[in-house]
C-alpha cells in the first residue's frame, strides 16, 4: 500500500511539473505569454531607428533558447526567470 501511495505522489508531482511552462513578456502586445518548449530565457532588445528622437528606442521582448547574438547598435539583455523582461517603460 505504501508503494502505491508513493507511486501516486511521484506521478502527481511529475504531471504538475510538466504543466508548468516558462513565460516571458513578448511584443508587440507586451503581455506575458508561455514560451515554446526549450526556450528558457527571456530577452529584451532595444535600438534606435530613424524615429528614435520622436518616440524613443524600439523595444523587442521575447523568449529564446539561447541569448540572441550581439548586433551593431542594439542592446540585448537576457534573463532566466519567469517574466523577468518587463517593458522598460512600464
Curated annotation (Swiss-Prot):
Major subcellular site: secreted
Tissue: Expressed by the venom gland.
Signal peptide positions (record): 1-21
Family to which the UniProt record says this protein belongs: Belongs to the three-finger toxin family. Long-chain subfamily. Type II alpha-neurotoxin sub-subfamily.
Molecular-function GO term, any one: toxin activity
Name of the protein described by the UniProt record: Long neurotoxin 1
Function according to Swiss-Prot or TrEMBL: Binds with high affinity to muscular (alpha-1/CHRNA1) and neuronal (alpha-7/CHRNA7) nicotinic acetylcholine receptor (nAChR) and inhibits acetylcholine from binding to the receptor, thereby impairing neuromuscular and neuronal transmission.
Disulfide bonds: 24-42, 35-63, 48-52, 67-78, 79-84
Subcellular location: Secreted
SUPFAM superfamilies cross-referenced by the UniProt entry: Snake toxin-like (SSF57302)
GO CC, alphabetical: extracellular region
Superkingdom assignment: Eukaryota
Keywords linked to the UniProt accession: Acetylcholine receptor inhibiting toxin, Disulfide bond, Ion channel impairing toxin, Neurotoxin, Postsynaptic neurotoxin, Secreted, Signal, Toxin
Organism: Austrelaps superbus
Amino acid at each position: 500500500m505504501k508503494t502505491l501511495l508513493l507511486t501516486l505522489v511521484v506521478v502527481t508531482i511529475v504531471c504538475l511539473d510538466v504543466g508548468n511552462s516558462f513565460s516571458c513578456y513578448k511584443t508587440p502586445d507586451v503581455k506575458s505569454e508561455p514560451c515554446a518548449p526549450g526556450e528558457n530565457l527571456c530577452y529584451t532588445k532595444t535600438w534606435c531607428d530613424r524615429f528614435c528622437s520622436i518616440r524613443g528606442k524600439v523595444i523587442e521582448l521575447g523568449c529564446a533558447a539561447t541569448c540572441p547574438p550581439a548586433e551593431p547598435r542594439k542592446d540585448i539583455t537576457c534573463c532566466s526567470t519567469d517574466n523577468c523582461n518587463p517593458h522598460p517603460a512600464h
